[in-house]
Amino acid sequence: MTIKSDKWIRRMAQEHGMIEPFVERQVRGADDSRVISYGVSSYGYDVRCAAEFKVFTNIHSAVVDPKNFDEKSFVDINSDVCIIPPNSFALARTVEYFRIPRDVLTICLGKSTYARCGIIVNVTPLEPEWEGHVTLEFSNTTNLPAKIYANEGVAQMLFLQSDEACEVSYKDRGGKYQGQRGVTLPKA
């Protein structure tokens, strides 16, 4: 597998709709203010977080069960910022919609700006022929409230292309998160 460059990412986004909307350069500032960078980079694409959050709360004293997840465990927030309580987490989604080619696996890594503040971003790999908005999980590992900024960079996608296409893709398997839009909760 080889990691793909900015030229390949740009071509796949513009000619094949791999990333929509696509920002073809690295954005570091907007309207004379600093932002956490997003857009294409040398060997990846920095995604933005949409202004749609689900913040975990345990007001119902529920047990977290991935096979039977209780939607009431989250508070919905639509805002340019999201405050995550200490030692808690929030779900969000990317601004960008992805269409992954059949011979590509995409790995997501959190941005160091957030990691250096104790905020960890987790996303499982985007499998061949998966498409949708990426659901992002932010863990606040600190004992203080933590802030996430919508419409700014939160994670980097790395695109790894295989020397041959897989026999069975995520789409072929009828993956349960195929075509997801918005923040998607666990499905068992």
Curated annotation (Swiss-Prot):
InterPro entries xrefs: dCTP_deaminase, dUTPase-like_sf, dUTPase_trimeric
Function field: Catalyzes the deamination of dCTP to dUTP.
CDD domains for this protein: trimeric_dUTPase
Binding site for dCTP: 111-116, 135-137, 156, 170, 180
Gene3D superfamilies for this protein: 2.70.40.10
Full protein name: dCTP deaminase
Family, similarity comment: Belongs to the dCTP deaminase family.
Domain of life: Bacteria
Organism the protein comes from: Pseudomonas aeruginosa (strain ATCC 15692 / DSM 22644 / CIP 104116 / JCM 14847 / LMG 12228 / 1C / PRS 101 / PAO1)
E.C. number(s) listed in UniProt: 3.5.4.13
Chain's gene name: dcd
UniProtKB keywords: Hydrolase, Nucleotide metabolism, Nucleotide-binding
Complexes and interactors: Homotrimer.
Any one GO molecular function term: dCTP deaminase activity
Annotated catalysed reactions: dCTP + H2O + H(+) = dUTP + NH4(+)
Lineage of the species this protein comes from: Bacteria, Pseudomonadati, Pseudomonadota, Gammaproteobacteria, Pseudomonadales
Active site per database record: 137
HAMAP family registered for this protein in UniProt: dCTP_deaminase (MF_00146)
Pathway where this protein functions: Pyrimidine metabolism; dUMP biosynthesis; dUMP from dCTP (dUTP route): step 1/2
Swiss-Prot/TrEMBL GO biological process terms: dUMP biosynthetic process; dUTP biosynthetic process; nucleobase-containing small molecule interconversion
